[in-house]
Amino acid sequence: MIRAMTTPAAVIVDATAYAQAVEDAAHAAAAYYAGGSSPLDDDAYDRLARGIAAWEAEHPDEVLPDSPTGKVAGGAAEGDVPHTVPMLSLDNVFSPEEFTVWTASLARRIDREVTRFSVGPKLDGLAVAARYREGRLTRLITRGDGTAGEDVSHAIGTVEGLPGTLAEPVTVEVRGEILMTTAQFEHANEVRIRHGGQPFANPRNAAAGTLRAKERAYTVPMTFFGYGLLALPGTDAALAGRLEELPYSELMETAAGLGVHTSAGTAVPDVVVGTPEQVVARVQEIAALRAELPFGIDGIVVKADLAADRRAAGSGSRAPRWAIAYKLPAVEKITRLLEVEWNVGRTGIIAPRGVLEPVVIEGSTITYATLHNPADITRRGLRLGDHVMVHRAGDVIPRIEAPVAHLRTGEEQPIVFPEACPRCGSDIDTSEERWRCAQGRNCHLVASLAYAAGRDQLDIEGLGTTRVVQLVEAGLVADLADLFLLRREQLLALERMGETSTDNLLAALARAKEQPLSRVLCALGVRGTGRSMSRRIARYFATMDHIRAADAEAMQRVDGIGVEKAPSVVAEIAELAPLIDRLAAAGVNMTEPGATPPRPADTDGADGATAEAPGDGGPLAGMKVVVTGAMTGNLERLSRNEMNELIERAGGRSSSSVSKNTSLVVAGEGAGSKRAKAEQLGVRLATPEEFAVLVAGLLS
């Protein structure tokens, strides 16, 4: 289910408050549509606009001319190129209940039920009109105030998806959105920073600024998605008549046939459904995929598909009556950066974290956001006290995109970087973007040991953080190998360690020695690897000796390890050699059950390969499997890591994301976006019970 909007209408108590609200909304809209930045985020603006509309409904004789409720785009900056047909805005709904009210109103207006709705993504970009004369793109115009827009034809040639020449020599106007994809936005900020500029706050801000820039020393790409096709003066009469009569869905097929980029090639194409209930279901499907899309959406657009229904409904001065925007909760909000905390990870990495003025995004209160590293802070020009744009989509960790520079008051303060490790006071290695304590793992011994003892690593029951601290402070443990050298009398001498606790811990340590190599490797905390990568390395090389003997070229043969990562993994393993030797001497297992070591490289230099790929012949041989949701039945007690281990023992490969290459998605209770994407792509789905039957031979 998609979350309901969490921002109700602003409460306006009198005419003075109403006038101030109109002024604030007009100022925000003008800034937003002129340059893509605004003192209000989307939720705050929607809340203000709804409050204005509610006050005007009760005081219809006191409506001010600057009110956003009567203006296209809330009062955007005007241009001097008139539109042949007004470019209107869309009215909004925020819940299934409001959508039901809108469909009932539409049915009353046209005196019949709508039987075909077109449902597609509401792209978070800038609306433009592209005019083609005899198939050639001659002019590009912004929406402006809806009646006239700004000529931005200088941007022709920099917008992907907007062809310079159509597939047929027709005279038409194509309407759509210009935006930046996530990749284009990241590239644009890199280029902008290299040229001495402040980073853009978000992709829409970047697209708006780039589209209007006429004299800039650099160019960055943008992307166009078409959503309209109409006749111009000079269009062939037969074609003009056909465009008037086509259903909206066929109009978009015609545009795509001319070479125009539409939503059809995305994971969220426009689809036609027959009932309001099916519309809401499609809204939920698109909302579930939102976090994984390579471009921003802020809602779903629902249109009456048939031309007859659109004509009968007509349009108001601000918006068509046959279309509505079903708004989704904002994934970006503006809040203040109050402080920066510096945390030390288990490998000694010193990571900054932004402390925020609490802000609600997608139903969750966000008080912290990642800042990546000191170089990223410098690139973005962040200061304490800054208003910042915070982004969070789905389960992604919230991140600070950029400062909202025009809201600065002059009281903001520089962010002070640490001169010594905030954990142990040692020197800091600043030779790479990610700063690291010079003591490395020793700085964070307690965290490293607690991590190694965790359920998904060595699974040492009874060895939590409190017990690890006790062992370290007693001088009994200085590294992971020391755990396996502990003697009964040493443990009995500790406070709160009786005979039962001691015997249980020693038994858990004995069991940990028998864990597969993949878990031992994961427990070592090799930088650049995690649970999944540790399994791949262990199953490829089969023994720790083969891993230690591998050079960077051999390491690259492991799926997912590229040219850049391989040398660092090899170097890390070499650095850990003394610890690995001590673990082996203590009796810790150094082999991966069921795995076969790779054959040596041929004498002519050919790559070595495994004699038999791990798991060949298993029930999941050659399959890429994704697990999502809560497991039930025989799988209920398995952690996600244990599920992934099971998949790989069965010959498959575990993955965290769904794509066209996914073979199977195991969807448990509460499965959300991954299940929706699997259905969208036609990927095979299985319940936990069905999957348990499939791998029954491997379940203990």
UniProtKB/Swiss-Prot annotation:
Residues 615-700 form the BRCT domain. It catalyses: NAD(+) + (deoxyribonucleotide)n-3'-hydroxyl + 5'-phospho-(deoxyribonucleotide)m = (deoxyribonucleotide)n+m + AMP + beta-nicotinamide D-nucleotide. Its cofactor is Mg(2+); Mn(2+). Zn(2+) binds at C421, C424, C437, C443. Keywords: DNA damage, DNA repair, DNA replication, Ligase, Magnesium, Manganese, Metal-binding, NAD, Zinc. Its EC number is 6.5.1.2. PROSITE patterns: BRCT, DNA_LIGASE_N1. DNA ligase that catalyzes the formation of phosphodiester linkages between 5'-phosphoryl and 3'-hydroxyl groups in double-stranded DNA using NAD as a coenzyme and as the energy source for the reaction. It is essential for DNA replication and repair of damaged DNA. This is DNA ligase 2. It comes from Streptomyces coelicolor (strain ATCC BAA-471 / A3(2) / M145). The gene is ligA2.
